[in-house]
């Protein structure tokens, strides 16, 4: 948790300097502060886009593997090197500066813009649900852009349609209560093959999950979704 409070204040300060109204939201001593930012559109006040980012980073150890101090932000060529440069401070500052440039150029934004910048993403966002419940109205929006993005080999932005989840499962198969000689393989079943058969019931050769009910809550792509995907280069 080193530097969490200081970093949240710094991010809020950067937002304000960029013309974005900002405040620090809190839940208590055991939760990292959340930085909130907002710009209201004059011409399109009924549509809101929210950017999600985080200001916390992974630990810097082992330090001896770094060529330069991890928080030096050293620039080599046109790239910044340092802890959090790509996860997730680089993306965050890019979005902030994009909004700042738009405001300076046009004096307005194309729709309401909101920023939700948390400080616990790297340890599982353990309090984000509490923040969402407490500040539901403040965080309301029509669409969310997640924390990062990619470009392809031709430097074209890649549009992601979602994020995968994580599921940890431990499978245990048992047969003999003690270690036995391989010569008994014809009469004592090998539990490893039980695991192989179990795994084979979970997913087919094309990657489709075979577990009953797995896709029940998945919304199918609409015709418009498919048309947009087909138009992508």
Segment roles from a protein language model:
Residues 136, 152, 161-162, 181-233:
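Acidic-enriched catalytic cores of C-N bond-cleaving enzymes acting on peptides and small amides
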Residues 81-82, 177-182:
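Short small-residue beta-strand/loop micro-motif enriched in glycine and branched aliphatics
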Residues 53-55, 77, 119-120, 147-149, ...:
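Fold-independent oxyanion-binding glycine-rich loops
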Residues 86-162:
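Acidic/histidine-rich catalytic neighborhood of metal-dependent amide-processing enzymes
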Residues 15, 19, 103, 139, ...:
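Structural signal for hydrophobic packing residues in well-ordered secondary-structure cores
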Residues 36, 114, 168-172:
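Beta-strand secondary-structure signal
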Residues 158-174:
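Flexible glycine/proline-rich, aromatic-decorated loop/lid segments
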Residues 1-85, 104-111:
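Acidic/His- and Gly-rich active-site-bordering loop/insert found
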């Amino acid at each position: 948790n080193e530097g969490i409070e200081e970093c949240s204040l710094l991010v809020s300060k950067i937002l304000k300097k960029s013309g974005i109204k900002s405040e620090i939201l809190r839940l208590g001593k055991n939760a990292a502060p959340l930085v909130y930012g907002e710009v209201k559109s004059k011409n399109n006040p009924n549509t809101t886009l929210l950017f999600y980012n985080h200001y916390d980073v992974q630990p810097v150890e082992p330090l001896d593997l770094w060529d330069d101090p991890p928080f030096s932000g050293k620039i080599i060529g046109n790239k910044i090197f340092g802890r959090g440069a790509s996860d997730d401070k680089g993306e965050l500052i890019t979005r902030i500066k994009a909004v700042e440039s738009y405001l300076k150029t046009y004096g307005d934004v194309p729709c309401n813009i909101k920023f939700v910048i948390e400080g616990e993403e790297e340890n599982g966002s353990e309090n984000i649900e509490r923040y969402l419940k407490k500040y539901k109205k403040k965080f309301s929006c029509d669409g969310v852009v997640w924390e990062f993005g990619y470009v392809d080999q031709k430097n074209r932005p890649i549009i992601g349609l979602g994020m995968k989840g994580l599921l940890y499962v431990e499978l245990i198969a048992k047969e003999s209560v003690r270690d036995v000689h391989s010569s008994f393989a014809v009469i004592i079943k090998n539990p490893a093959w039980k695991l192989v058969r179990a795994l084979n019931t979970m997913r087919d050769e094309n990657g489709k999950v075979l577990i009953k009910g797995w896709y029940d809550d998945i919304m199918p792509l609409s015709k418009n979704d498919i048309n947009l995907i087909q138009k992508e280069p």
